[in-house]
Amino acid sequence: MSATPTLTVLSVLVTRPAADAQHWVAQLQAQGVQAQALPLITIAALADPQPLYHIAQRLDEFAAVMFVSANAVAYFFAQLPAAQQQAWSQGRCAARAWSPGPGTTRALMQAGLAAQQIDEPAADAPQFDSEALWAGVAQQVRPGQRVLIVRGSDEQGQGSGRDWLAQQLTAVGVQVENLSAYRRIAPRLDEVARVRARQAAVDGTLWLFSSSEAIHNLVAPLPTQDWRAARAIATH
């Protein structure tokens, strides 16, 4: 009986936004994995930050503010007036900060919040996501409370991302507001990136996707590419 052939993973392509991708690449390379970044989402500032300024005046109305990512933290606090930043970091704003994972928690602490102001998934959670966060915060919410979810918007200005956590909160009587703090837009792939993508579609490279947006932004500029031999991991 002949042995089943194995396909060696030549490399991993990380498709997260540039700053996030570089962190993932460094972590993978530290484990001996050949990893490269091919960002398929570009993070950009809002064209109109006025909605964020209005929300900043109302932070005390919220029992918690959930940040979907480190990018949400960075762009929210970059546009948050200094007085509101100081009030929150000094504990004069009672809103809890919710984080889906360690990267977002680090960003919150770098923004000035203390660890005791932040709720995040348990350290031994099998996955860092909204489900793991909800397992830790579900018991602290009460009907009638308000929770703000800070996330990104797409190129049309529509909120992007999963609505799972908002659905759980609404189901238990919590009022949810969404706030876009940044835009997620499709990058323009240059010829080098297109060549690498075409090569990775057939050479055993493992694509690492963390959103359906990234997949769309890969396929759209390469309409004639055959992806049937491509290999990928999706984080959710």
Per-region residue spans from a language model:
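Conserved beta-alpha
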Residues: 1-235
